[in-house]
């Protein structure tokens, strides 16, 4: 039985939770206790959705500006992009349009995108008093439509909320995209 490999790349501002999301998902829901900054990392995770096995090759990228020359090196052959912002960091949300979509259009136009709002557990946190600047779900949904994302979802790595659903959607979208684009492969002889 052939196992399909899906290349997933995560991008977004520094500190939005890319590494934590991937570590939690690939470690069976175990939230990491220490923060480890990432320049570039690759997680491999086997998933079974609707009886079909897939090997997820998930690339974690650094969000800092000083890595803008490194990120494009991993874009070739990407099947789907996870574009992350943190709901408590409005600047990371605004950077989706001002920074990230520009980079995507330059290096991998037409790639399927899932827009992901992270850290939704903070909406219910008693530790944060002023939540007036938090990004609301409807704002994320509107932005996903504006940028032409295939899907929008929110999740919490700390509470392991929405991660399984996110990666089920990744597999479904890549399967649909491959079925619709079987004849669009470029072959150079």
Curated annotation (Swiss-Prot):
- What is a biological process (GO) this protein takes part in? regulation of actin cytoskeleton organization
- Primary location recorded for the protein, binned into one broad class: membrane
Has UniProt tagged this entry with the keyword Membrane?
Answer: yes
A GO cellular component annotation in the UniProt record? cytoskeleton
Question: Keyword set for this entry?
Answer: Cell membrane, GTP-binding, Lipoprotein, Membrane, Methylation, Nucleotide-binding, Prenylation
Q: Which SUPFAM superfamilies match?
A: P-loop containing nucleoside triphosphate hydrolases
- Stretches that traverse the bilayer: none
Q: Where is the lipid attached (S-geranylgeranyl cysteine)?
A: 186
Chain positions listed as propeptide in the UniProt record: 187-189
Q: Does the keyword Nucleotide-binding belong to this entry?
A: yes
Question: Its family?
Answer: Belongs to the small GTPase superfamily. Rho family.
Could you identify this protein by its name? Rho-related protein racM
Record the organism: Dictyostelium discoideum
Task: State the taxonomy lineage.
Answer: Eukaryota, Amoebozoa, Evosea, Eumycetozoa, Dictyostelia
What gene does this protein come from? Answer: racM
């Amino acid at each position: 039985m052939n196992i399909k490999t899906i290349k997933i790349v995560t991008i977004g501002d520094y500190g939005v939770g890319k590494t934590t999301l991937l570590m939690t998902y690939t470690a069976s829901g175990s939230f990491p206790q220490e923060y480890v900054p990432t320049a570039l990392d690759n997680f491999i995770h086997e998933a079974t959705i609707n009886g079909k096995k897939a090997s997820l090759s998930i690339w974690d990228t650094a969000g800092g500006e000083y890595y803008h020359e490194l990120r494009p090196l991993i874009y070739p052959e990407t099947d789907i992009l996870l574009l992350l912002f943190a709901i408590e960091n409005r600047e990371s949300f605004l950077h989706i349009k001002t920074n990230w979509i520009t980079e995507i259009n330059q290096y991998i136009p037409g790639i399927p995108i899932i827009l992901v709002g992270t850290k939704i557990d903070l909406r219910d946190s008693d530790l944060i008093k002023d939540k007036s600047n938090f990004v609301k779900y409807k704002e994320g949904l509107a932005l996903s439509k504006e940028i032409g994302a295939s899907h929008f979802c929110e999740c919490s790595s700390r509470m392991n909320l929405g991660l399984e659903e996110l990666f089920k959607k990744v597999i479904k979208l890549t399967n649909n995209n491959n079925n619709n684009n079987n004849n669009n492969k470029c072959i150079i002889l």
